[in-house]
């Protein structure tokens, strides 16, 4: 096992990356190795998908499946070795189907195909024991014995960034949004990474290409969500519980939440959101259901305690999943789509009957808590509608600065920085937030500036797109570059979605971003220095000193 893709990976003076019997996320060495094999097999699929475009051989089914399978290897998604093997064997079958069809078409059209990449040559046996034996060939750091560590680090930056983009591609696909050009670019990049590239400049360029592609993907996802559920609007959400049977929906998939709401109508079941599902309460086509009663719990790293105390059924629609056996709620947990845990019930399709039956069999909450309301729903339309008023307040000197404080949350005590930062931000500043990092401070009171709330919840991690649109609108209004705005991004990262959002911001030319709590372990000191110089990226330090530097700029 060697895994170094998330923020909590092992980092000591002598070791970087998880390389023991189990990773810090809880996945076993077996699952980690199988995920590497799956990724390598997917690079082989992309090789033939890219070659296929030379001879007009395109399989929509494979285009849509490949990013979904890649998503299964993201941090805290799938821990089930049998499911990962199924994905890998399906990749092998699709690769063979593509190769046969493409070679036949190339013969007919007399088209010259590229030389096979190492990933394209990679073949899987059918037996699990034989598959796992191939792990050394597929290791994400393959070649590290002879290649410079900077090359390995940049390969991983591109791989993990592309993995985050693939996750957003799958979220968009579920909502009916696909793009043939995005599929083509995805396959081109994935196939190229399967050649084990060694040019530092080309790898840096590739990371920017991934960032720009993800900007388009986030636009697609924004379209899918708003076309399906309406535009988010500022809405009050109860973060306390009420009496009754209950279902908890976690992850990111609004489609699944809608299906659950439809199928629980009239059954006396209250539905709660958890984690990144919080923004669901602001979408008109979701909040219209009266039994969508509130948001339960906080960020993903607290789920083992919070899920154990939830007296109903729990549905995990995407990342982030933790070991459910710790809190002994595995018998009430259901996984969806790419998510998996050994022994936990998995639901294919849109029939949630087993979830409903489970919820009805549980005790449910016995009494009503005193409600506590928070406000969500400052999505793209709401932000753009507020832009003229915001501009006026800036011109009048009532708003001095904007901070975007958000990203992934996690266990490390250093993450209290983000709580302290928002608490100490000047009272004439406005704080935008998104993703689960918001749970560090979103129940605190920030007041308003002449009717404009000082804390604006933009939404899920992918709703960085909305924040970018506001920044671009403000830059246009003030006739300045986006980096000349009184705007500072203070981001927390944990996994690969955060990596690709950072690449997107870099690719769009956004500079001066503060990131933490620690630097990605796969980036060497040399690479960090390059990124810091090129994009003026800063590491978080002391809140007081950072604020002083920001406001003095």
Curated annotation (Swiss-Prot):
This is Hydroxylamine reductase. Keywords: 2Fe-2S, Cytoplasm, Iron, Iron-sulfur, Metal-binding, Oxidoreductase. Its cofactor is [2Fe-2S] cluster; hybrid [4Fe-2O-2S] cluster. It is an enzyme of class 1 (oxidoreductase). [2Fe-2S] cluster binds at residues 3, 6, 18, 25. The gene is hcp. Its main location: cytoplasm. It is found in: Cytoplasm. The keyword Oxidoreductase applies. The modification Cysteine persulfide is found at residue 408. InterPro entries: HCP/CODH, Hydroxylam_reduct, Prismane-like_a/b-sand, Prismane-like_sf, Prismane_a-bundle. Catalyzes the reduction of hydroxylamine to form NH(3) and H(2)O. It comes from Aliivibrio fischeri (strain MJ11). Hybrid [4Fe-2O-2S] cluster binds at residues 252, 276, 320, 408, 436, 461, 495, 497. Binds 1 [2Fe-2S] cluster. Binds 1 hybrid [4Fe-2O-2S] cluster. One of its GO terms (cellular component) is cytoplasm. The keyword S-adenosyl-L-methionine does not apply. It catalyses: A + NH4(+) + H2O = hydroxylamine + AH2 + H(+). Belongs to the HCP family. It holds the Pfam family Prismane. One of its GO terms (molecular function) is 2 iron, 2 sulfur cluster binding. NCBIfam families: hybrid_clust, PRK05290.1. SUPFAM superfamilies: Prismane protein-like. Its EC number is 1.7.99.1.
């Amino acid at each position: 096992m060697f895994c170094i893709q998330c923020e909590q990976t092992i980092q000591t003076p002598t070791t970087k990356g998880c390389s023991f019997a189990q990773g810090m996320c809880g996945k076993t060495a077996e699952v980690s190795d199988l995920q590497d094999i799956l990724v390598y097999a997917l690079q082989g699929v992309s090789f033939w998908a890219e070659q296929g475009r030379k001879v007009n051989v395109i399989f929509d089914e494979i285009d849509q499946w490949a990013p979904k399978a890649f998503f299964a290897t993201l941090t805290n998604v799938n821990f089930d070795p049998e499911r990962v093997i199924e994905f890998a064997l399906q990749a092998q079958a699709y690769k063979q189907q593509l190769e046969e069809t493409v070679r036949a078409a190339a013969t007919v059209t007399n088209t010259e195909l590229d030389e096979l990449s190492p990933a394209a040559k990679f073949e899987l046996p059918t037996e699990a024991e034989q598959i796992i034996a191939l792990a050394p060939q597929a290791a994400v750091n393959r070649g590290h014995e002879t290649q410079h560590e900077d090359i390995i680090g940049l390969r991983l930056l591109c791989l993990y960034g592309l993995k985050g983009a693939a996750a957003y591609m799958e979220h968009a696909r579920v909502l009916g949004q696909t793009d043939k050009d995005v599929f083509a670019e995805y396959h081109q990049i994935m196939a190229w990474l399967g050649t084990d590239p060694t040019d530092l400049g080309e790898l840096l360029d590739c990371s920017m290409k991934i960032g720009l592609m993800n900007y388009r993907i986030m636009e697609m996802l924004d379209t899918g969500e708003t076309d399906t559920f309406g535009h988010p609007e500022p809405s009050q959400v109860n973060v306390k519980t009420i009496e009754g049977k209950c279902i908890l929906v976690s992850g990111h998939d609004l489609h699944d939440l809608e299906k659950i709401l439809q199928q629980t109508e009239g059954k006396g079941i209250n539905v709660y959101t958890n984690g990144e599902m919080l923004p669901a309460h602001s979408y008109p086509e979701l909040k219209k259901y009266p039994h969508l009663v509130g948001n339960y719990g906080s960020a993903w790293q607290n789920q083992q305690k919070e899920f154990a105390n939830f007296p109903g059924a729990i549905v995990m629609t995407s990342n982030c999943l933790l070991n459910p056996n710790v809190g002994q709620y595995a018998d009430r947990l259901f996984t969806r789509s790419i998510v998996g845990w050994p022994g936990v019930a998995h639901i294919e399709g849109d029939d949630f009957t087993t979830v409903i039956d489970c919820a009805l069999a549980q005790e449910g909450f016995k009494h009503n808590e005193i409600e506590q309301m928070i406000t969500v729903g400052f999505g793209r339309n709401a932000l753009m509608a507020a832009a003229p008023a915001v501009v006026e307040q800036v011109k009048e000197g009532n708003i001095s600065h904007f901070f975007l404080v958000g990203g992934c949350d996690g266990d490390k005590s250093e993450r209290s920085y983000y709580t302290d930062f928002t608490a100490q931000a000047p009272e004439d500043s406005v704080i935008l937030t998104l993703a689960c990092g918001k749970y560090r401070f979103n129940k605190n009171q920030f007041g308003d500036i002449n009717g404009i709330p000082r804390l604006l919840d933009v939404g899920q991690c992918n709703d960085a797109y909305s924040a970018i649109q506001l920044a671009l609108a403000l830059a246009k209004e003030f006739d300045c570059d986006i980096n000349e705005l009184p705007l500072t991004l203070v981001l927390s990262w944990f996994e690969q979605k955060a990596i690709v959002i950072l690449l997107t911001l870099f690719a769009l030319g956004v500079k001066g971003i503060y990131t933490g709590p620690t630097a990605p372990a796969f980036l060497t000191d040399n690479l960090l220095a390059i990124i810091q110089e090129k994009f003026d990226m800063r590491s978080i330090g002391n809140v007081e000193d950072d604020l002083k530097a920001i406001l003095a700029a």
